[in-house]
Amino acid sequence: MTVLKEQPPRLLRGTPLASKGLRKTFGQREVLKGIDLHIPAGQFVAIVGRSGCGKSTLLRLLAGLDQPTAGQLLAGAAPLEEAREETRLMFQDARLLPWKKVIDNVGLGLSGDWRPRALEALDAVGLADRANEWPAALSGGQKQRVALARALIHQPRLLLLDEPLGALDALTRIEMQQLIERLWRQHGFTVLLVTHDVSEAVAVADRVILIEDGEVGLDLTVDLARPRARGSHRLAALESEVLNRVLSTPGTAPEPDPVAPLPTQLRWAH
């Protein structure tokens, strides 16, 4: 596997993020209630919480798929809107076009001599040998690797992950976690991962943020060396701390279904 070429130093790669008084309402329901966050460049942040707590809404605001009712979203000192070209979003569904071969899915929307870059991105995720196959021939984990390659080809500074591993089997999920972590360490982009899996959050993130009823209920630093030994006492203790806090919070109604964006409005991992 290769590393994409011409990468600046790690700490210069990621987008620094901040939210100030971030609020979002749907009708009479306030889903986010004044979120204040500061995320340094290159940090790996996991966002957890019960269904309906507002975590997916927060990610959609960061991706520009919804607009906040109030508050600010910043990339450094500038509006986050100015960093959209350097932002990519991955979903649980890889969203590959079945009528395009793997390499063409990676290079979707690009012009010029993009094929060598697409092959390089596929090699970085271990799928260079599948470049000329159809998506239907791939497993679920392989499709998510293609989606990740589709993000890498754009050399993003901010990668937003909305439950991208939720549909994978346990072993494939761990392999994908390790791949995402390795690529993050190589390229230094900022990562925000929304997940229901507390063990996943603690295993891969620098920091775990728990959203409770639209507010930050817990902001926990995961100060453990990498690579992390799964099953270690310290990892289990941190997982238990977050999980106990999640379980102590009563469930809320599901977040409202957002209006699906048009393909031209959405920057997937492509």
Swiss-Prot record:
Signal sequence, start to end: none
UniProt catalytic activity: ATP + H2O + aliphatic sulfonate-[sulfonate-binding protein]Side 1 = ADP + phosphate + aliphatic sulfonateSide 2 + [sulfonate-binding protein]Side 1
Membrane topology: Peripheral membrane protein
Highest taxon of the lineage: Bacteria
Chain spans, region Disordered: 248-270
Cellular compartment(s): Cell inner membrane
Alphabetic keyword roster: ATP-binding, Cell inner membrane, Cell membrane, Membrane, Nucleotide-binding, Translocase, Transport
GO molecular function: ATP binding; ATP hydrolysis activity
Binding-site positions, ATP: 49-56
Main location: membrane
GO cellular component, one term: plasma membrane
Group of enzyme by EC: translocase
EC number per UniProt: 7.6.2.14
Domain ABC transporter: 17-238
Subunit comment: The complex is composed of two ATP-binding proteins (SsuB), two transmembrane proteins (SsuC) and a solute-binding protein (SsuA).
Family, similarity comment: Belongs to the ABC transporter superfamily. Aliphatic sulfonates importer (TC 3.A.1.17.2) family.
Functional description taken from the UniProt entry: Part of the ABC transporter complex SsuABC involved in aliphatic sulfonates import. Responsible for energy coupling to the transport system.
Protein name: Aliphatic sulfonates import ATP-binding protein SsuB
Species for this entry: Pseudomonas putida (strain ATCC 47054 / DSM 6125 / CFBP 8728 / NCIMB 11950 / KT2440)
Organism lineage string: Bacteria, Pseudomonadati, Pseudomonadota, Gammaproteobacteria, Pseudomonadales
